[in-house]
């Protein structure tokens, strides 16, 4: 299953202009390409390295973010160190504003501090993991309840789960 459609619908409904979807590293290019396609947005990629565990360094942006609204998309936000560095890199490259989206908000350790330092307008996540107390105001949580309900109903009624996702439940 994927929350891609919940997240992209949310961003479509926001009506943001001049969007560029930004992959935080090479491992997320396919996900971000699909996300960008659903929004009719451009795609940019960050060159990220991890010199040590929980340490992210981003060298440069591949693609044009100048004057655009960037949406950084990942599957998980854990300590938010990658998100903080990615946001700063994209803003330094001239992005007008930065948003972020992820399915799973682990948000461990100093994640809330990293988010506060990231300069992100809004972080959109799903309710697959409850947020701990003190979550920043710029985090928006979307429900996966309908997606799960429809998937379970399809399984028990012997219908295709792929239909719940319009036949696009495979990202790769």
Where are the model-predicted features located?
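PRPP-associated nucleotide enzymes
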Residues: 1-172
């Amino acid at each position: 299953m994927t929350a891609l459609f919940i997240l992209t619908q949310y961003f479509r409904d926001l009506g943001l202009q001049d969007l560029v979807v930004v992959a935080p590293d090479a491992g997320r290019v396919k996900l971000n390409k699909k996300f960008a396609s659903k929004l009719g947005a451009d795609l940019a990629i960050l060159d990220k390295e991890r010199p040590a565990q929980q340490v992210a360094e981003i060298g440069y942006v591949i693609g044009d973010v100048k004057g655009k609204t960037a949406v950084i998309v990942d599957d998980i936000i854990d300590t938010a160190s990658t998100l903080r560095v990615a946001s700063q890199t994209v803003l330094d490259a001239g992005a007008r504003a930065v948003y972020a989206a992820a399915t799973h908000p682990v948000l461990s350790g100093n994640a809330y501090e990293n988010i506060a330092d990231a300069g992100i307008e809004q972080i959109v996540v799903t309710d697959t993991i409850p947020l701990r107390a003190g979550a920043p105001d710029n985090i928006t949580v979307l429900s996966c309840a309908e997606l799960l309900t429809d998937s379970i109903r399809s399984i028990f009624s012997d219908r295709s789960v792929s239909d719940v996702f319009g036949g696009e439940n495979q990202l790769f």
